[in-house]
């Protein structure tokens, strides 16, 4: 289990100066050729998403203005707050900020031939499935994960195991991404 606080994470500026990324975790850890990766991006200007052949990207707008996504003749989509949207990461996707507002989004990328992610918003206590990887990011409220208290802009990632996330207040929202390994693959085989 790895814990993080977005306010304390290192920031990597994009080459095109249109934004910045805070990498949460990758699996396998510290590998450039990852099977899955979670990150938070701040987007300050219109531009294209980086290409990642053989990967799927799920992007969830956390805050800021809506973002219009366009991929030639494949899709046009308006990204709205807390509504995950998946697309192939090997296609050119242009992002246009609405009303010129900066936005912040959560990204999870998975290698299509190894694993698949599912992203959802939780508003009550839940338990993850065992032997699957995952990432949580607190949008608001106070959540208990094991002996650790997680609050706004904090989270955790893990590579396997069963975990209970307990909402400690009447209301709260948490982004949860679960990683499912495809047949013939498991975390034990790739470490």
UniProtKB/Swiss-Prot annotation:
Q: Which CDD domains match?
A: cupin_HutD_N (cd20293)
Give start-end ranges for the coiled-coil region(s): none
The similarity comment for this entry is: Belongs to the Ves family.
Q: Which InterPro entries match?
A: RmlC-like_jellyroll, RmlC_Cupin_sf, Uncharacterised_HutD/Ves, Uncharacterised_Ves
The name under which this protein is listed is Protein Ves
Disulphide linkage map:
none
Q: Per UniProt, what is the name of the gene that codes for the protein in this document?
A: ves
Q: Which Pfam families match?
A: HutD (PF05962)
Provenance organism: Escherichia coli (strain SE11)
Q: Which HAMAP family match?
A: Ves (MF_01591)
